[in-house]
């Protein structure tokens, strides 16, 4: 991909994307396909109407080299929407717009993904899937020393650990599998000794 801007000469297209960035021309060459200033301005207008928080400077920065996965995602969704739903989209822009999607989608592998948000209590409490102490668990004696011990991550990958007291399995199904380490047996029959399977 070649990204080209110019701030000398006659402005090629009268649009805020060029005016507010002090440019006279802008274009991108993707896979030997020329993407003109007119096309980029058209995409910007639709993008801005769908995602009002974007401005001319942010859009230009993203075109030069995306550094935010969320902005890149909304940019690609906008172009795909234009290609599939926009009846006013000129036919001569279809191939260049498709080339833009093809090139910019490759940036995803280079962008560091944001840390996933989680509603999993075990993930929030455990640091790097290490056991953590809890003050009490319903069904265990109040004076018991209790730990939650993660035994697999969300993908089902087993977590290795050693040196724990007797481990008990809860019958509840959670996204994050864990067992309970206790120095005292449970008061409830719903907890069974975990055999490691």
From Swiss-Prot:
Cite the Pfam families for this sequence. Answer: Tenui_NS3
Organism superkingdom: Viruses
InterPro entries under this entry? Tenui_movmnt_prot, Tenui_NS3
**Keywords in UniProt for this one?**
Host cytoplasm, Host-virus interaction, Inhibition of host innate immune response by virus, RNA-binding, Suppressor of RNA silencing, Viral immunoevasion
* GO annotation terms (biological process): symbiont-mediated suppression of host innate immune response
Give Gene Ontology CC terms. host cell cytoplasm
Question: What is the annotated localization of this protein?
Answer: Host cytoplasm
Quaternary form? Homodimer.
> Which family is this protein grouped under?
Belongs to the tenuiviruses p3 protein family.
Briefly state the protein's biological role. Answer: Acts as a suppressor of RNA-mediated gene silencing, also known as post-transcriptional gene silencing (PTGS), presumably through the binding of dsRNA.
Q: What is this protein called?
A: Suppressor of RNA silencing p3
Q: What organism does this protein naturally occur in?
A: Maize stripe virus
